[in-house]
Curated annotation (Swiss-Prot):
It comes from Danio rerio. Residues 171-186 have a biased composition (Pro residues). Residues 170-200 are annotated as: Disordered. Residues 8-146 form the MABP domain. It is found in: Cytoplasm; Endosome; Late endosome membrane. Residues 215-266 form the UMA domain. Disulfide bonds: none annotated. Keywords: Cytoplasm, Endosome, Membrane, Protein transport, SH3-binding, Transport. GO terms for molecular function: SH3 domain binding. This is Multivesicular body subunit 12A.
Amino acid sequence: MSVCDSSIRPVSAMAWASNTSTCPGHFTLISQTEDGASANFSRGFVRSGYFLCYSKDLSGGMVVADVQVITDKGTILHGYCYIPEYLEQKASVAKKKRVCVRLVPVGSVTTAVLDLKLTTKHKSMVQQYTCLGDMNGFVVWCLKGPFSPPAPQAKPRRVSLDIRSLSLDGPAPPQPLKPSNPPEAPPKVSRRRSKLDLPAGGVCDSSVCSGISAMDGVPFTLHPKFESRSSSTKVSVITLSDIRIKSVQDIENEYNYTFTVEELAAKRIRPSLSG
């Protein structure tokens, strides 16, 4: 197996299994070492044996980025976990040395563990493989390298969904949201103003009435007593003796205005165009 071959599927999980019957279906059980010896990690005849197995099923979306063999007194690193056990009822795995792995999403890395091998202790070497350590008389080796993530497969669509998408009946339009805070009520208009704003027909458009004023059509002219001041070129000096203090009644009498002209202008009837 070459490291340069990027088409190799990476290892997605590792575990312990008593035999092929307890080993999950998508796992491969390592029954023999590279030098032909039995890969049973249990040396006794009374105890049930257990084997190292691995999987390359990527349906779970995870891959093994690294493998470590640590002692029972060692501390497992952050992001690592011990491999699961699929054993018979009375079987157990020795805890003197344990295998831990680091699982990562398949799309987050470009290199991962590609293969695992076992050899008998101090008897053979595996080219291009990394030695992880010895366990119960075996040496664990792993091969790391680049891999190509599987191409995403399109999910099958149901025919009913395709027919529904071709239907001419479009989805119902969304209903307008009702405001939680209704707009404030418009201010009340006085009786005189309401009469002036109404058109001759008696029907008033809200968009038009807001722009109508009682001063529409009334020409602007200055009072005669102010015309002499505006026409003179010399600025007259106002002394304190010219200031007259007026009472409230004098001001009301001077500026009293009945709006008679404006009422007549508002009541004017526009001539209708005869055909």
